[in-house]
Structures are given as structure tokens and as C-alpha cells.
């Protein structure tokens, strides 16, 4: 087996350093690559991590000189032994920290697409391409830069093809998206598990600067239609997403929530979760009551009783008593009668208030 000094010598010679004749360079490089390929094959079949760690360095060293060699490593990963997979995942980040991002991007996207030959694309469930994306994203953040535009565009273009794993591939890139890209990827994010979804929304909200301002993110979530067409998302996931935003009180402040809701209540048709968000805003921000009254007035002017939101509207008004008395008085007679019939406690309070007003 080759020791570290030998590895460095072979790599140096393969790159042509100190070799005068091109023919000699080609011959040495071919031998180095052939031996490295054999070592890679043996490493991926190794049953012990120690053996895999002993055989991989030559191949990884040559990847420094020829990043396109990453393709074979990525392609062979899924069929490798458990020990080899663990070793590759341990060693790969160190390599990716030093390779040109553009070169890694080209190899990674080609493998995800199944290019350039007829070989099947990498499995979307494989941890290796996801690991590579996270390493590149962390590196870009640490360096105060960004990831290559080709990486962002390429991964987002593959999100739908990657099925349920598509959202996970977008997560590392969220801080680097522009507004239109962030909006486009939201449906895929909402197909993540609840915990991953919460982390993804936090990554969007805490990015500097965020691709979507907090109020814009809330608005876009309300614009998504549950299980309706290509952009449809599971209703439970949409509820979880909006609630996760509301729970991020440092980012989604009272002002951000009410500003977003002022836009939501003007939408036509009114989003299905409008009243739920208003109620949760009241619960999380009791001092938002005055702003909420303004939202409820707007909805009443828009004849909210003719929509599916009416039940939630009445519930919200009952929660807001006594501030909401005027809203009950402004309801059409038939709707007021039905609302009071289902909430006799509110009826008693309104009657008592009316009597007090007459007595005064």
C-alpha cells in the first residue's frame, strides 16, 4: 500500500510537476489513476472502516487535481458496504472544503440527473449528495459568499423529479435563494416532515437577508391551496407551517403578523386558513386585539358570512368580547340570530350591555 509521501509524489507527478516529458506525465498519470480506481473499488467493498480509511486517501487526493473523479465516488456510494459509506461520509467534507465549488456543482448535478451516460441517477434518498450540498452551503456561509448560481438553479430544477426528497435538497440552499425561487420551492418544503419543515422555515426566516420578508412568507403560505392542483399541499402541513411562523416570535412579531393579515383579508377568494391565523395571532399576541378588530371589520364588510370562514369568524368574535360587541351589532339579522343561538353566553352579555346602555 502507498504511504502518504508516496501518495503526494504520485499526485505531484500526475499533475506534471517536475516532469519534463509529456509522454512520461501521461504514463504516470494513467498508472496513478488506475491504481486509485482499484483502491476506490476495494475501499467501497471494505467491511471495516479502518480498511476503507486506508484505501481512500489516494483517490481523494487525485480528486483534488481532477474533481471530475468525484463522479465515480458518488456513483459507487449506494452500493458500498456500511463501513465504506460511513468512512466516505467522514472524509468527503474535508475534500469538498478545498475543491472549486463550480467543479463540484458540475459533477453533483450530472450525477443527480444521471448524466452523461445512461447510468441511473443517484438515489434521492442517498445521504451523500445531501451531505455535499450541506458542506457547500456551510462553506459559502463561512466564507461570506454564496453557492454557484448553477447549483441553486440545478437543484431547484430537480426538486419535482426527486419526489418526497425534493424539499430536503432545497433546504441547504434556502439562504441563497431569491424571492421568486423561495416562493416556488414552498410546496416542496411543505412535504417535509414536521420537524424538518420547521427547520426549513426557520432557515428562510433567519437568513441575512431573508429571501422572503416575514410578512411576505406568511402571505405566500396563505396563497397556497391545500391539495389543489400542482401547487397543492397537504392541509395539515400548511397549518403546521403557518403555526411554526407564528411561534417564531422574534421574527414574526405582532407588527409582521398583523401586516401580513391585512393583506390576507383583502385576497379574493379569502384563504381557507385566514381565521385560524387571526385566532392564533390573538392567542399569541393578546395586545394585538385592536389590530384584530380592524381585520374583523374588513371581513364583515366583505360579507364573510357567505364563506366557509364564517364559523371561525364568529368564534373569533366571541373570543374578543367585549371589544367585538360592535361586530355582532353590525351582523345581518339572520346571521346575528344564528351566531347568538350557538353562543348563548355572548347573547347574555350583549343583552346585559344593551340594557345598561338604555339605563344610562
Which role fits each region the language model picked out?
Residues 1-360:
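Eukaryotic alpha-helical solenoid repeat scaffolds
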Amino acid at each position: 500500500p502507498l504511504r502518504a509521501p508516496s501518495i503526494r509524489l504520485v499526485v505531484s507527478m500526475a499533475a506534471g510537476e517536475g516532469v519534463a516529458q509529456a509522454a512520461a506525465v501521461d504514463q504516470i498519470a494513467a498508472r496513478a489513476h488506475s491504481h486509485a480506481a482499484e483502491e476506490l473499488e476495494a475501499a467501497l467493498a471494505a467491511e471495516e472502516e479502518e480498511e476503507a480509511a486506508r484505501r481512500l486517501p489516494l483517490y481523494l487526493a487525485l480528486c483534488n487535481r481532477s474533481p471530475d473523479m468525484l463522479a465515480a465516488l458518488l456513483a459507487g456510494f449506494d452500493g458500498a458496504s456500511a463501513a465504506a459509506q460511513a468512512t466516505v461520509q467522514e472524509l468527503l467534507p474535508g475534500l469538498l472544503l478545498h475543491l472549486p465549488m463550480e467543479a463540484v456543482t458540475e459533477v453533483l448535478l450530472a450525477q443527480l440527473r444521471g448524466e452523461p451516460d445512461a447510468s441511473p441517477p443517484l438515489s434521492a434518498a442517498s445521504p451523500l449528495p445531501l451531505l455535499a450540498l450541506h458542506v457547500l452551503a456551510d462553506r459559502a456561509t463561512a466564507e461570506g459568499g454564496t453557492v454557484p448560481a448553477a447549483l441553486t438553479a440545478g437543484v431547484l430544477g430537480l426538486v419535482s423529479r426527486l419526489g418526497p426528497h425534493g424539499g430536503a435538497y432545497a433546504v441547504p440552499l434556502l439562504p441563497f435563494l431569491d424571492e421568486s425561487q423561495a416562493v416556488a420551492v414552498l410546496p416542496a418544503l411543505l412535504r417535509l416532515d414536521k420537524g424538518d419543515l420547521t427547520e426549513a422555515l426557520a432557515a428562510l426566516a433567519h437568513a441575512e437577508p431573508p429571501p422572503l420578508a416575514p410578512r411576505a412568507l406568511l402571505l405566500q403560505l396563505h396563497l397556497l391551496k391545500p391539495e389543489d392542483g400542482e401547487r397543492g399541499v397537504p392541509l395539515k402541513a400548511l397549518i403546521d407551517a403557518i403555526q411554526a411562523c407564528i411561534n417564531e416570535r422574534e421574527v414574526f412579531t405582532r407588527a409582521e403578523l398583523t401586516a401580513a393579515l391585512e393583506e390576507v383579508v383583502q385576497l379574493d377568494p379569502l384563504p381557507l386558513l385566514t381565521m385560524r391565523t387571526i385566532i392564533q395571532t390573538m392567542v399569541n399576541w393578546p395586545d394585538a386585539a385592536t389590530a384584530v378588530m380592524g381585520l374583523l371589520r374588513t371581513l364583515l364588510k366583505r360579507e364573510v358570512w357567505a364563506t366557509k370562514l364564517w364559523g371561525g369568524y364568529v368564534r373569533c368574535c366571541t373570543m374578543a368580547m367585549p371589544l367585538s360587541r360592535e361586530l355582532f351589532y353590525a351582523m345581518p339579522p339572520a346571521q346575528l340570530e344564528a351566531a347568538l343561538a350557538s353562543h348563548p353566553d355572548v347573547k347574555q352579555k350583549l343583552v346585559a350591555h344593551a340594557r345598561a346602555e338604555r339605563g344610562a
